[in-house]
Amino acid sequence: MASRVICFLSLNLLLLDVITRLQVSGQLQLSPKKVDAEIGQEVKLTCEVLRDTSQGCSWLFRNSSSELLQPTFIIYVSSSRSKLNDILDPNLFSARKENNKYILTLSKFSTKNQGYYFCSITSNSVMYFSPLVPVFQKVNSIITKPVTRAPTPVPPPTGTPRPLRPEACRPGASGSVEGMGLGFACDIYIWAPLAGICAVLLLSLVITLICCHRNRRRVCKCPRPLVKPRPSEKFV
């Protein structure tokens, strides 16, 4: 009997898209409308029959990765019995009836169970189908925050003159001047002019000493001749 039901459903559900558009009405209500499941999570779907005139409910599944329109029969459940598809694991799928609600339980969700689930009932020789419920793996989206660049600090204006090489003679923002000296890069701009001035002064002093020494050698140190007085000058 169960195999006949499976064959009957398989033949009638080849035109699933057309049938669902024609027969989906207020007879069936499926909840939740969408499921984002994690791997290993238990998933429960509830098919509520608003007019309980059916003898049972069938759960079906359409794989999202399959190109075939034919869905896969999962389980048939009624108030007295339930029949699972022979190719499915009984530890994975189970179903039960509570009043006018038919509950399908997927014990451990995996990627191969992703797809669209729906239920079907037969009432007065008419098949009714519920809307498709997408059941897919939950995607954890990672939101990256934009990186904002810190504004470049502007140094305050100062009244002191800028050095010739500020990058060499001025310490950095995080650096510190170590030791007593300013460093060779800065000392050369201070001592070079001083050394030049000292050299000019020394050269001037040497030239002055040489000139003075030559002038002293030109002075005649010979004794002066004695001038004898004339006779006319003696008896005046």
Swiss-Prot record:
Q: Which residues are glycosylated?
A: N63, T144, T148, T152, T158, T160
Reported modifications of this chain:
Palmitoylated, but association with CD8B seems to be more important for the enrichment of CD8A in lipid rafts.
Q: How does it sit in the membrane?
A: Single-pass type I membrane protein
Query: In the UniProt record, does the keyword Transcription occur?
Result: no
> For the lipid attachment S-palmitoyl cysteine, which residues are annotated?
C211
What start and end residues bound the annotated signal peptide? 1-26
One of its GO biological process terms is:
positive regulation of calcium-mediated signaling
- Its source organism is Rattus norvegicus
Q: How does it assemble?
A: Forms disulfide-linked heterodimers with CD8B at the cell surface. Also forms homodimers in several cell types including NK-cells or peripheral blood T-lymphocytes. Interacts with the MHC class I HLA-A/B2M dimer. Interacts with LCK in a zinc-dependent manner.
The residues that cross the membrane are 190-210
Source lineage: Eukaryota, Metazoa, Chordata, Craniata, Vertebrata
Q: What is this protein called?
A: T-cell surface glycoprotein CD8 alpha chain
* Record keywords, A-Z: Adaptive immunity, Cell membrane, Disulfide bond, Glycoprotein, Immunity, Immunoglobulin domain, Lipoprotein, Membrane, Palmitate, Signal, Transmembrane, Transmembrane helix
Presence of the UniProt keyword DNA-binding in the record:
no
Location of the protein in the cell: Cell membrane
Membrane side Extracellular: which residues? 27-189
